[in-house]
């Protein structure tokens, strides 16, 4: 099984995560940010990852440090759990609708860190979560996992719906890209390395 445990402690945050890529979608999330907990729960459930995240951060300042650092920790956890990446499917694109919102997420488990994010969000906050932190989370996650990640809003207006569709689509896309293809042998690259 592809599993990882990652801890990260700074003067701003203290974060612990457990991940099982080949899970059932079980989750235990406690970041102190209700809406973010909900999004990470959706991510795990729809990606079929078993995920535990416990985060303590300087929420008296704002949610930025906690959200970004959870992205760093989860990126590292996925990198560690993915191992040598032999026989993975590598690529995936997933569309998720949430009422009027439609989001497309494309993933390449490439070893090359890149984020393209086009998510215009009208609301500055959803609950106590600053919506600009969606992109901060995605960037930290992509760069620490070493993946190319494209996230685009195709249409929609409700910020909650857009963000929810994003986290669900990310979970689904990663589930597909990390799946083992029994037909494939070795690393899915002509270079022989990812």
From Swiss-Prot:
Its main location: cytoplasm. One of its GO terms (molecular function) is imidazoleglycerol-phosphate dehydratase activity. CDD domains: IGPD. Pfam families: IGPD. The keyword Cytoplasm applies. Keywords: Amino-acid biosynthesis, Cytoplasm, Histidine biosynthesis, Lyase. Its EC number is 4.2.1.19. One of its GO terms (biological process) is L-histidine biosynthetic process. It is an enzyme of class 4 (lyase). InterPro entries: IGPD_sf (IPR038494), ImidazoleglycerolP_deHydtase (IPR000807), ImidazoleglycerP_deHydtase_CS (IPR020565), Ribosomal_Su5_D2-typ_SF (IPR020568). GO terms for cellular component: cytoplasm. It is found in: Cytoplasm. It comes from the Bacteria. Pathway: Amino-acid biosynthesis; L-histidine biosynthesis; L-histidine from 5-phospho-alpha-D-ribose 1-diphosphate: step 6/9. It catalyses: D-erythro-1-(imidazol-4-yl)glycerol 3-phosphate = 3-(imidazol-4-yl)-2-oxopropyl phosphate + H2O. Belongs to the imidazoleglycerol-phosphate dehydratase family. This is Imidazoleglycerol-phosphate dehydratase. It comes from Thermoanaerobacter sp. (strain X514).
């Amino acid at each position: 099984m592809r599993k990882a445990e990652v801890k990260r402690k700074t003067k701003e945050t203290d974060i612990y995560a457990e991940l099982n890529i080949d899970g059932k979608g079980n989750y235990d999330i406690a970041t102190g940010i209700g809406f973010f907990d909900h999004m990470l729960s959706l991510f795990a459930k729809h990606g079929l990852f078993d995920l535990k995240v416990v985060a303590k951060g300087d929420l008296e300042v704002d949610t930025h440090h906690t959200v970004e650092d959870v992205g760093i920790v989860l990126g590292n956890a996925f990198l560690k759990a993915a191992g040598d990446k032999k026989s993975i499917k590598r690529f995936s694109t997933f569309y998720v609708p949430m009422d009027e919102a439609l989001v497309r997420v494309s993933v390449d488990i490439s070893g090359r860190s890149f984020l393209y994010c086009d998510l215009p969000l009208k609301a500055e906050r959803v609950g106590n979560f600053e919506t600009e932190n969606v992109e901060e989370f995605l960037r930290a996650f992509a760069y620490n996992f070493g993946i190319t990640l494209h996230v685009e809003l195709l249409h929609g207006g409700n910020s909650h719906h857009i963000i929810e569709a994003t986290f669900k689509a990310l979970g689904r896309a990663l589930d597909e890209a990390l799946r083992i293809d029994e037909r494939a042998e070795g690393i899915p690259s002509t270079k022989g390395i990812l």
